[in-house]
C-alpha cells in the first residue's frame, strides 16, 4: 500500500529518487502510464499493473469504449526500473503529457503512485480534499 506525499526536483537527466520505504515494492519494476483524465503519471508496481490488465479483460463495457481505454492506458505505457540509487527517469512523452517541469510530487494512492508537476498537484490536492468529505458523507448514507 502506498500513501503520503513526497516532493522532489528532477536532475539534469530527468531523474528523481523515490522514497526508500517504497523501493522494495518496486523491485520487479513498474509501469508508468498517463493518468486517465488527469494531468499526472500513474506508476504501478508490475504486479498491480497485471491485476489491472486482467480486471479490464473481464469488464462488460462496450467494445468500442474498451478499445479506447486500452489504447489510452497500454499504448502510452512504459516498463521502467529504478536505477542503483533508487531513481526513476520519466519518459519524455509522459513528462510532456503531465506538464512536469522541475518540481514533482509523488503521491501514494493505495495500490499505485501518482506523479504530478508540483503546481498542478497543489490545485488538484485542494479540489480532492474538498470533494473527499462530500464523497465520504455519501458513502455513509448508503
From Swiss-Prot:
Compartments (UniProt record): Cytoplasm, Nucleoid
State the name under which the record lists this protein. Answer: Transcriptional regulator MraZ
Species, as recorded: Dehalococcoides mccartyi (strain ATCC BAA-2100 / JCM 16839 / KCTC 5957 / BAV1)
The keyword Coiled coil belongs to this UniProt entry's keyword annotation: no
This protein's GO cellular component annotations are: cytoplasm; nucleoid
Q: Please give the superkingdom of this protein's source.
A: Bacteria
A single GO BP = negative regulation of DNA-templated transcription initiation
Is Transcription regulation one of the keywords UniProt gives this record?
A: yes
InterPro entries for the chain: MraZ (IPR003444), MraZ_C (IPR035644), MraZ_dom (IPR020603), MraZ_N (IPR035642), MraZ_sf (IPR038619), SpoVT-AbrB_dom (IPR007159), SpoVT-AbrB_sf (IPR037914)
Task: Report the NCBIfam families cross-referenced here.
Answer: division/cell wall cluster transcriptional repressor MraZ (TIGR00242)
Q: What is the lineage of its organism?
A: Bacteria, Bacillati, Chloroflexota, Dehalococcoidia, Dehalococcoidales
Any one Pfam family here would be MraZ
Ranges of residues in domain SpoVT-AbrB: 5-48, 77-120
What GO molecular function annotations does the UniProt record carry, in alphabetical order? DNA-binding transcription factor activity; transcription cis-regulatory region binding
Fill in the subunit field for this protein.
Answer: Forms oligomers.
Main subcellular location of this protein, as a coarse class: cytoplasm
Which family, according to UniProt?
Belongs to the MraZ family.
Key words, A-Z: Cytoplasm, DNA-binding, Repeat, Transcription, Transcription regulation
